Amino acid sequence: MADHPLIRDYGADAIFAWRDGRPVGVNQFLRDVTQLAATLPDRRHILNLCADRYRFLVGFSAALLRRQISLLPPNHTPNLIDQLARQYPDVYCLTDGEDEHPALSTVFYPEFPDYTTVVAPPVPSIPATQIAAMVFTSGSTGEPVPYQKSWGGLVRSARAEAERLGLAAHPGMVILGTVPPQHMYGLESTVLLPTQNGLAMHACRPFYPADIRDELEALPRPRGLVTTPVHLRALLAEPVRPPLADFLLCATAPLSPQLAADAEARFAAPLFEIYGCTEAGQVATRRTVEAADWRAFPGIALRQDDAGTWAGGGHVETEVLLADVIELRDDNTFLLHGRTADLVNIAGKRTSLANLNYHLNSIEGVIDGVFVMPEENGDSITRLTAFVVAPTLSAETIMNALRQRIDTVFLPRPLCMVDALPRNATGKLPRQALHELVTNLAARAG
């Protein structure tokens, strides 16, 4: 299998990235990668904790040159890092922060001089079969499990994404992301998507609506935003109109058609959703205002058996059993009906937590909300519970709205108003976080 270049489709004077309000050229990036690669220890595995997206990419690229595998766990808690240290004894940490982890030797990201006037080294090529990263399941379906990602698979994914989303119509677009690069969605769509298609990446990761608006407004057009439903909902809840954009991309949970239409109108840009998982990477897309169906990427085949739905082919190098209930419409289009583990059966009636969450979050005034089915506990009756962030609404108002949307057997008992939900950096709610919510509720009630 052929090699693939580290970066692709950049002219000599092209802007490669934006950082601290200033453009970074291709020459600077290639010099930074070469310099950092020369300083990395001779190890097999690297834990790249750089929060700055540009520095993360320099570290990821330098590791590729040294044939090192980047470990990308779902979180960076001390317990998980200790677990990685036991599982991969030679792993070391690259960070641009001040924290050191006792279990790991640490390399602090150095400051490099300005190389803009120096001739850059040539763009290196990386073997397609080289293992570039080890990504881990998010923890929302159990304990993290590692999955290898080859450089060739990652490159094919990034190029297929750009083609599907029509980004050739926006040469030089700057991609701003609200998701971290250490997660599969962030790696694919805020790091590899721009660098394999001649686009510019943005180094920062704004979180609050005002910061997202400010960072996006400061960028030249064309500009795109890669985000999550949580960030998007918070942005649109603000009275301030967001800056115009040329492209919106969302993932980690399905959007409602209403929210998607509102986003397209407010940003004056098309919004696309990505469906995927850590195990397979990105699998399908849809433009939510046009269709509920998802369309698989070229080359990806879906098949079903008694175990569920499998995805393989294209950039998905090993066939993967998807964790969702999927209705195949034809060879490459399908509908999602929630996660397999989310099916709820009460009084002979069936639905999914995803469907219930959809209706809960479609209520005007609900900023965030989630249904939870607690684990059965002895002889006590297990009831659906909902946790809702809605500062302007009462629990009674929300319950009345739910009665208009869902069968009464699925109404939450209780419905708990909270200040915020414990989402992780990509907007997901890990199983352990939901368990703690329910446990704390039971402790207060008991």
What is each model feature region?
Residues 344, 371, 385-387, 401-446:
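Conserved C-terminal "lid"/linker of ANL adenylate-forming enzymes
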Residues 25, 124, 132-159:
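Conserved AMP-binding A3 loop
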Residues 237-291, 301:
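Gly/Ser/Thr-rich phosphate-binding loop
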Residues 323-410:
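AMP-binding/adenylate-forming catalytic core of the ANL superfamily
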Residues 37-76, 173-181, 350:
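Conserved AMP-binding/adenylate-forming
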Residues 88-97, 148-164, 170-234, 272:
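AMP-binding/adenylate-forming
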Residues 7-12, 114-136, 168-174:
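Conserved pre-ATP/AMP-binding loop-to-beta segment of ANL
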Residues 4, 10-40, 149-152:
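Conserved AMP-binding/adenylate-forming core of the ANL superfamily
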